[in-house]
Regions:
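Extracellular/periplasmic carbohydrate-active domains that bind, remodel
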Residues: 1-195
């Protein structure tokens, strides 16, 4: 799937499929919706929308995700274009010194679950409202020369969070964020994938 240069594509959530490359050409931008109803909800433990809005996804699976893949071996995102996560739609400036993100929902930008032989190459992500790239239960993950440029006032806007993954290579990336640039995780929410 190719997003051609010179366009901004406004989108609800995207579900990556097996062996599909989402290629964002240089000069193309895909911008996440500000409408929370347009997001995929992978956290099957949350059935009550009110709980999803106040629940903290740090220890569980994300409540809302912009780009999602499940059992999508060989999927990838590539190209020199931009993913604009539209994070400021989900946080508010409390005062001149502090942006609050203590309320939810705050969607994860990319959550790839139980998928092997996957890659993320060359693109830029800006303005994440929460974690940026969260592979979980994956094997053979390549993250190569991506740039993550998040607002330094937005708490928990982690860069790259491999969670219960194996054989992960992170090469030549640039990450600017208000929390962990790279954090290896073994979260409770993804414990089904082992250590």
């Amino acid at each position: 799937v190719v997003l051609p240069s010179g366009y901004v594509f406004y989108s609800d959530s995207i579900r990556l499929k097996k062996n599909v490359d989402l290629h964002i050409q240089k000069g193309a931008t895909i911008k996440a919706t500000s409408n929370i109803d347009g997001y995929i909800r992978p956290n099957k433990l949350i059935n009550d929308p009110k709980t999803a809005l106040i629940g903290n996804p740090v220890t569980g699976k994300p409540s809302f995700v912009f780009i999602y893949a499940y059992e999508a071996d060989g999927c990838s995102i590539s190209g020199e274009g931009t993913i604009d996560a539209n994070g400021h739609a989900f946080v508010a400036r409390k005062d001149q010194y502090y942006v609050t993100g203590d309320f939810y929902p705050r969607p994860t930008v990319m959550y790839v679950e139980k998928s092997n032989h996957i890659s993320f190459r060359d693109f830029t992500v800006v303005d994440a409202p929460f974690w940026t790239l969260h592979p979980a239960g994956c094997d053979d993950v390549l993250i190569d020369k991506i740039r993550i440029l998040n607002d330094l006032d937005v708490a928990n806007s982690d860069g790259i969070d491999p969670d219960h993954c194996s054989n992960v290579r992170i090469l030549g990336c640039h990450v600017t964020c208000a929390d962990d640039c790279i954090c290896l995780k073994a979260s409770k929410g993804n414990s089904e994938y082992g250590p």
